[in-house]
């Protein structure tokens, strides 16, 4: 974009030459995704359960929600009868560091996500702990919603408790993102491991 602006300035004879022509753009370093192997799912979920976080992280593993989508869930987003979660909002940090409720990243991100009956049962049990709170996963400290970064920190603690190597929270959703789902066998193994928990 900057190059185009300077090209316009050269064309209009505002400057003699485009100073960006000699610039070399740095290469964007891709971060390799790590997948939680199916054989580690049980350990991961047991560690989440010991911290009282099983419903949240079980839902994450079966739905692949983004952290901001997970924290923005309300009880009204759960359709118990049809076993779906409505994803229509997310919490993100604005430049001031404050949380803002926004639409999801893209229009296709506004969706209904099917979840297994076990996830529904865990969510109903979680709701019974705080029936008057509108948030699906309120913070036990404040009763308000979690900050999205707090979810990431909890994920790191769960990995440590389970003795598992570091995997980014974002990578938990890897098998659920259509354009990255290449290994159907691995996806089936992961689904089976979650069902067996």
What are these regions (language model features)?
Residues 3-7, 54-71, 178-179:
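Short pre-functional
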Residues 42-53, 63, 113, 127-145, ...:
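Short, basic (Lys/Arg/His-rich) helix/loop patches that form interaction surfaces
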Residues 11-17, 27-46, 88, 95-116, ...:
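DNA breakage-rejoining catalytic core of tyrosine-based enzymes
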Residues 22, 26-53, 62-65, 73, ...:
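Long, amphipathic, Lys/Arg-enriched alpha-helical "connector/arm" segment
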Residues 77-84, 184-197:
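Short, polar N-cap/turn motifs at the start of nucleic acid-interacting alpha helices
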């Amino acid at each position: 974009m900057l190059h185009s602006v300077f090209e316009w300035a050269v064309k209009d004879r505002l400057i003699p030459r485009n100073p960006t022509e000699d610039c070399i753009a740095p290469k964007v370093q891709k971060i390799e995704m790590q997948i939680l192997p199916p054989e580690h799912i049980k350990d991961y979920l047991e560690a989440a359960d010991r911290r009282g976080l099983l419903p949240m992280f079980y839902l994450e593993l079966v739905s692949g929600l983004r952290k901001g989508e997970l924290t923005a869930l309300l009880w009204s987003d759960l359709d118990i009868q049809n076993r779906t979660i409505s994803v229509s909002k997310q919490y993100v940090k604005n430049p001031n560091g404050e949380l803002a409720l926004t639409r999801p990243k893209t229009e296709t991100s506004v969706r209904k996500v099917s979840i297994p009956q076990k996830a529904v049962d865990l969510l109903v049990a979680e709701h019974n702990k705080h029936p008057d709170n509108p948030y699906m996963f309120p913070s036990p400290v404040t009763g308000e919603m979690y900050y999205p970064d707090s979810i990431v920190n909890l994920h790191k603690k769960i990995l440590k408790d389970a003795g598992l190597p570091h995997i980014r929270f974002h990578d938990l959703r890897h098998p659920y993102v259509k354009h990255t789902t290449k290994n159907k066998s691995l996806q089936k193994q992961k689904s089976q491991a979650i069902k067996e928990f």
